Amino acid sequence: ISTIKALLFLLFFVNQIINDWKKQNYGQVIRSVGPESHLEKGGTPTMGGILILGAIIFSCLCWGDLQSKFLWILLFIISSFGAIGFLDDYLKLKNQNSDGLSGKSKLFWQFSFALIAVSILYFSAETTQETSLILPFFKEFSLQLGIWFIFLSIFVIVGTSNAVNLTDGLDGLAIMPSVMDAGGLGIVAYM
């Protein structure tokens, strides 16, 4: 139900917002390196992450357990990584080139926000199960990670975020990698 509600939220707003962005020339600046086919994508409205994150946040607030610390940590990570992406896209539009935030700046902020979120999870854990590695098909087996939970979790959060960013690197249009990423994570979370 929450997925359907997020989709309806997107469908309700997406056309109006994309048309407004086209009028204001909020289009993707394409790198000159790479295949010529990517140049055709120049001018495609950018900052779609705002729509996707808006739908996710809306759905979480409507259907999530607002008493759960996990929901609020999820919203913190989504919002903070979304802010990094927004700033990156904003700088690209402002400067009219494909250079946004530097890679080092992005990684610094991603690691910083992930460290904050994971530290809260680790230090507020009520049981060792909360900081254990549980394999989807072998739920009876769990590996207690101790302090390594922090390092592994940061690696997974930053790595997952950058899996999409690096995949869409040439043209900056991340919808298909995002769909695949979200689908895979959704399946694992469901198990």
Regions found by a protein language model. Give the residues of each.
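"…together with the soluble PPM/PP2C metallo-phosphatase catalytic core" -> "…together
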Residues: I1-M191
